[in-house]
From Swiss-Prot:
Formation of pseudouridine at positions 38, 39 and 40 in the anticodon stem and loop of transfer RNAs. The gene is truA. This is tRNA pseudouridine synthase A. It is an enzyme of class 5 (isomerase). Belongs to the tRNA pseudouridine synthase TruA family. The lineage of its organism: Bacteria, Pseudomonadati, Pseudomonadota, Alphaproteobacteria, Rickettsiales.
Length: 245
């Protein structure tokens, strides 16, 4: 039977979602071990969005196949019991069709990048936001972001380690919400290149700091090279919010 779980986690202390050969500190491995501890079955867990080290999730989605049949609330509670000392929580579990795949069945992924824009240290949010000390012009950031909407070659906004064969992606929505000194960059698309959201966030911050002409974003896009865009924002400000199916 195939089960789908929705997962929330604090990514600060993990090596990322995906299992790694020389590390036992991935989120995937922690959940697989928790499932084994209550079911006795060695399962393979597949996720909807592979987050890097330090990245958080409010609504990661994963699936696994298990022979043992359990009531859904028991699956959720049993996994959480075996994760109780770890900042990973299963929010809910459901049975899905065998054709469902957490990665390949996804129709849209939603990310949010969180910034605190003030000079005084963000004592209560360290590790959960990127603190930018210089004042940001959010209106310029919004105007620059509009040029990223739609279908583009996003080679300027992917890491040098990105292995995607095709750099063309379609950004469905990008919105920048300001509440006092908190700035959230919200972005959604069916798929993303490696580090795409973090590089976009870093680039938009540079626009906001330097009061750069928003039209300059078109030049960055046209260059199709990583060096044209801004810095890669730190991982701890990034959240995988949810995935639509």
């Amino acid at each position: 039977m195939r089960y789908k779980i929705t997962v929330e986690y604090n990514g600060s202390s993990f090596s990322g979602w995906q299992k790694q050969q020389h590390s036992a500190n991935s989120i995937q491995e922690k959940i697989e071990n928790a499932i084994f501890n209550f079911s006795g079955e060695k399962i393979a867990l597949y996720c909807g969005g592979r987050t890097d080290a330090g990245v958080h999730a409010l609504g990661q989605v994963a699936h696994f196949d298990m022979e043992k049949e359990c009531e859904l609330y028991r699956i959720r509670n049993a996994i959480n019991y075996h994760l109780k000392s770890i900042p990973i929580v299963v929010l809910n579990a459901e049975v899905v069709d065998d054709a469902f795949h957490a990665r390949f069945s996804a129709k849209k992924r939603y990310y949010e990048y969180r910034i605190v824009n003030r000079y005084a240290p963000a004592a209560l949010e360290t590790g959960y936001v990127w603190q930018v000390f210089s004042p940001l012009d959010v209106n310029i950031m919004r105007e620059a972001a509009k040029h990223l909407l739609g279908k583009h070659d996003l080679s300027s906004f992917r890491s040098k380690d990105c292995h995607a064969a095709n750099p063309i992606r379609t950004i469905d929505d990008i919105d920048i919400v300001q509440n006092g000194n908190h700035i959230h960059i919200k972005i959604s698309a069916i798929s993303f290149l490696h580090n795409q959201v973090r590089i976009i966030a870093g680039t938009l911050v540079e626009f906001g700091k330097n009061r750069t002409n928003p039209q300059e974003m078109l030049h960055i896009l046209s260059q199709c090279k990583r060096s044209a865009a801004g810095v890669t924002a730190p991982p701890f400000g990034l959240y995988l919010v949810k995935i639509d199916y």
